[in-house]
Amino acid sequence: VKIMRGGAFKPRTSPYSFQGTGFEGLEMFREAADNAGLPIVTELLDVRHLDKFLEQKVDVIQIGTRSMQNFELLREVGRLKVPVILKRGMSATISEWLMAAEYIASGGNHNIIFCERGIRTFETYYRNVLDVTAIPVLKKETHLPVIIDPSHAGGKAWMVAALSRAGIAAGADGLLVEMHPTPSEAWCDADQAITPTELQKLMKELSAIANILGRDISK
């Protein structure tokens, strides 16, 4: 595990769902990551939060699916030197996603990581459809890293391993995976979180797949 991700501010479909712990949570998150010797990534929802993010030395800023076309937000992070994970909007085309990245790059920040997190289709059995095809397309169209979020794509913990394997086989450079020591007690996204033991097992499987393809994802 290279980086710790957590949401101090949580964009939720319902205003009555848990919205995160705010700036206090960001401080606790920073402290926990420092104790573990890990950098942090967290989602930026509002340009008014940016100063606090910089004060807490957020290592990587995440632009979530709902903010992919928040152009003022994209312009602001484009002025920084902080790496940005740009998640695909749930109904966004590849072209729209690429143009969102251009908003960031046009400000001078080329430290952009694309994250495929599933798109909305007519299917209702699972949350979203992980667009594995997007991985080789982005690899062809850009020189930038591409990662996937199998947790939000399927929305269920039992889907995470299969989607992760598909993503690595298709050429993804990394994963964003929800993990919790006791998923049933998680305040949000409990259904899609896997345990630390399951994550360790998954990483061994993914390393084996990558090795077959002549890649090393262990570094």
Stretches with model-predicted labels:
Residues 1-10, 26-34, 40-41, 60-61:
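Active-site cofactor/substrate anionic-group-binding motifs, chiefly glycine-
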Residues 5, 19-21, 38-50, 59-71, ...:
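Catalytic beta/alpha-barrel core
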Residues 5-24, 180-191:
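Glycine-rich, proline-tolerant flexible connector loops at the mouths of alpha/beta enzymes
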Residues 18-42, 76-83, 132-147, 192-215:
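Alpha-helix-loop-beta-strand connector modules within alpha/beta enzyme cores
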Residues 19, 23-26, 47, 71, ...:
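Electropositive phosphate-/nucleotide-binding environments in soluble metabolic enzymes
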Residues 53:
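Conserved structured catalytic cores and adjacent interaction surfaces
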Residues 80-179:
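Catalytic alpha/beta core domains of metabolic enzymes, predominantly
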Residues 155-219:
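C-terminal alpha-helical cap/extension of soluble enzyme domains
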